[in-house]
Amino acid sequence: MNLKFKYIITFLSFVLITLSSCSSNKSSKKIVYKKVETTTPKPSETKKPTETVIAKIETSKPKEEVFKVTLPEVNREFRAAWVATVANINWPSKRDLTTVQQKEEAIKLLDMLEANNFNAVIFQVRPAGDALYKSNFEPWSYFLTGTEGKAPSPYYDPLEFWVDEAHKRGIELHVWLNPYRAHHSSGGPVTSESMVKKSPENIVRLKNGMYWFDPADKKTQDHVSEVVKDIVSRYDIDGVHFDDYFYPYASYNGGADFPDNTTWNAYKNK
C-alpha cells in the first residue's frame, strides 16, 4: 500500500467519525410537547374595558357680580275702581255724615270691591284745591264736612283710614288728584280757607263758576308738586293718579280763551 492510498484511507475515516458524532448528538435531544388546557371565561367573569373619562376644564374670566333688585310680586291684572268724592258722587254720600257713618260707608264700598275680586281702588283725595286728609298746604274739603277747612269730628284722617282698610283686604290704595281745579261749582261758597283766596294771583275764575289754577304759572306747578310729595311721604299709598290735568274745556269758560298769555309766554321762553 503506497503512501498516497494511506492518506485517502485516513481522510475518509475522519469524515465517518465526524458524521457519526453529529448523528449521535442529534439523537440525544428529545422534544417534549406540553398540553395546555384553555378555558373560555364565563360571561360574568369577563371584564369590561375600563372607560376613561376625560374632563374638559374650561377656564374663563370670573363673572362680574350682577346687581339684583328684589321687587314685590306684581298682580297679573289691574282691576281697579274709582271712588269719586267731588259733589259726593260715591263717598261720602252726604256732607253732614258723622265720623262713624263715613267709616261705615267706606267699609261697605271696600267689602263690595273685595267680594267682586277688585285688587285696587283709586280714591279721590283732592277734588278741587282741597283735601280729604290732613294737609298743611290745602284746607279740609267741603265735600267731607260741609264746611271748607273744617276737620271731621270726632277727628280721624280719611285717607289713612282708607289705606288701612284697603290693605286689610289685599286691595291697593291709589290716590286721585285733580291738579288744576281750584274750586268746584258744587263746592259751596268761596271762603277765606279756600285756595282761591290764599293764592289769587295764579287762579282764574271761569264763566261756569269754577276756579282754575293756571297750568303755565310756576307757582301752580310748584304748589301741586308739594302737595303730591306731601302725600307720598306720609301715607302708605300704592299709586298716584291725575285727572283733569289740562286746561278747562271751552264750555267751562263760555268758549273764551284761557287768559294765560303772560304766563304761557314765560313758560315757553324758559
Stretches with model-predicted labels:
Residues 18-21:
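C-terminal motif of bacterial Sec signal peptides marking the signal peptidase cleavage site
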Residues 23-25:
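Bacterial signal peptide processing site
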Residues 76, 84-104, 164, 174-175, ...:
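Active-site-adjacent "subsite" loops/lids of carbohydrate-active enzymes
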Residues 116-154:
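Aromatic-lined carbohydrate-binding/catalytic grooves of carbohydrate-active enzymes
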